[in-house]
Amino acid sequence: MDSKTAKLIKSKNTAIEMILRRKLYSLGYRYRIHSADIPGKPDIVFSGKKIAVFCDSAFWHGQKYLAGEKFKTNNEFWERKIARNIERDAKVNNLLTQNGWRVLRFWDHEIKKDLDGCIKQIKSVHETQGN
């Protein structure tokens, strides 16, 4: 993948976000999406409960990189890019946590393979967090 191709990839309303959001909505949960006023612009936000949910691509957010998978081309560029993404995610997690938020991050493959498990985690936090 080159940087021109990368720019074409959606960052909002991705397939994995839509899968998770539709399931939550069908269960009666109401939320905001991509809230610009919250650090990291979480994919799903339960404002009153201070819960931020991120649907992370294993590629873009570094799971494959951390597992030692190499990039096919332009390895140095991608290593820097993914390392910055990982660092930014950690900063966002810390900032939100310091401000009383619960942060949930799900890998794309977790949402695809175990949607019910992801929902169960969200439900559990939703029931115990805040109001």
Language model features: what each stretch is:
Residues M1-N131:
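Nucleic-acid endo/exonuclease domains
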